[in-house]
Amino acid sequence: VEAYEALMRVKMPLLNSPLTVMKLAREMDKLYEVERLTAFKATSTFVMMQNRGRLHRNTKLFLNSIASSSLTDEDVAEFKAQFAELLNNLVIEITEEEEIDREALERKRRALGDQGALALDDWGSGYSNSNSLLELSPDYIKVDITIICDIDTDADKQQLVKDIVE
């Protein structure tokens, strides 16, 4: 296994899905809190699993990040201090459920520095398009499932993915 993606799972019946949590967080202006909690909790769980020998040291962690939110400079400093040994394994996934905030994106790039990588998640859905590929210049492109589904029998989908790769 080369990489794992950290996914949000909800244990409360009233908040029955990650989409519900994100909608509520957006309505309550709490996306930053979700961004911070996700980054720290997912990464600390990943480190714990590595320390227990359940994950190889070179395994990458794909960490979902909200396009319009970013950690503060203080958060980034704390994160780097706490997880310095993992930074080269970290891939920040930009999800495009909403339009990308250019300032937030630049803060994410600065936080990564020469370490870590950037991924564009669910390309082909939401706000994602060719412009986002050019603007983000991601290290990884995760193509949306609607494009990948039945790609083995759909020549148009095959050509689309071929064009992205080339």
Where are these regions (language model features)?
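Short, contiguous acidic/charged loop-to-helix segments that flank catalytic cores in large enzymes
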Residues: 25, 151-155
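Conserved long alpha-helical elements within nucleotide-processing catalytic cores of c-di-GMP signaling
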Residues: 19-26, 32, 110
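Catalytic core of bacterial c-di-GMP phosphodiesterases, primarily the EAL and HD-GYP domains
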Residues: 32-107
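Structural detector of well-ordered beta-strand residues that form the stable sheet scaffold
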Residues: 7, 62, 119-121
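Cyclic nucleotide signaling catalytic output domains
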Residues: 20, 24, 41-44, 64, ...
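A short, well-structured catalytic beta-strand-centered motif of the EAL phosphodiesterase domain
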Residues: 1-23, 42, 141
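The catalytic core of metal-dependent phosphodiesterases that act on cyclic dinucleotides
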Residues: 81-151
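Alpha-helix-loop-beta-strand connector modules within alpha/beta enzyme cores
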Residues: 160-166
